[in-house]
Amino acid sequence: MRHYEIIFMVHPDQSDKIPLLIEKYKKIINDNNGIIHRLEDWGRRQLSYSINKLQKAHYILMNIEVFPKTITLLETDFRFNNIILRNMIMSVKKAIVELSPILKLKDDKKEKK
């Protein structure tokens, strides 16, 4: 099995469907004997440039360990799911389990308040 980092952006008007979408992808990964090392919901964030006349998107980050055929299933679903604006799947050398810098920054801001 290989390690992957996946980031996908969801249409901001569909933020209420995020938990269902995450459960769907968790099920695909678990049904294919995969392991989820990290799952982060970054929430709604400003886009660097507009995509389909949108200025914001809901970001989800996953670090998983799966067989390549599972990545093919996920890529196909990302491609044909019209609420997903963009996605990026990167192969990584090892599992990343610590918090991402974006989530660390959010936690630091909450602690200061």
Swiss-Prot record:
- GO cellular-component terms in the record? cytosolic small ribosomal subunit
According to its UniProt entry, the protein's GO biological process terms are:
translation
Q: Which PROSITE patterns does the entry link to? A: RIBOSOMAL_S6
In terms of Gene3D superfamilies, this protein maps to: 3.30.70.60
Q: Name one GO molecular function term.
A: structural constituent of ribosome
The record's InterPro entries line, in alphabetical order, gives: Ribosomal_bS6, Ribosomal_bS6_CS, Ribosomal_bS6_sf, Ribosomal_S6_plastid/chlpt, Transl_elong_EF1B/ribsomal_bS6
What Pfam families does the entry give? Ribosomal_S6 (PF01250)
Asked if the Swiss-Prot or TrEMBL record annotates the protein with the keyword Ribosomal protein, the reply is yes
Which terms are listed as keywords in the entry?
Ribonucleoprotein, Ribosomal protein, RNA-binding, rRNA-binding
The question of whether Transferase is a record keyword is answered with no
Task: Write out the similarity annotation.
Answer: Belongs to the bacterial ribosomal protein bS6 family.
Q: What does this protein do?
A: Binds together with bS18 to 16S ribosomal RNA.
**What protein does this entry describe?**
Small ribosomal subunit protein bS6
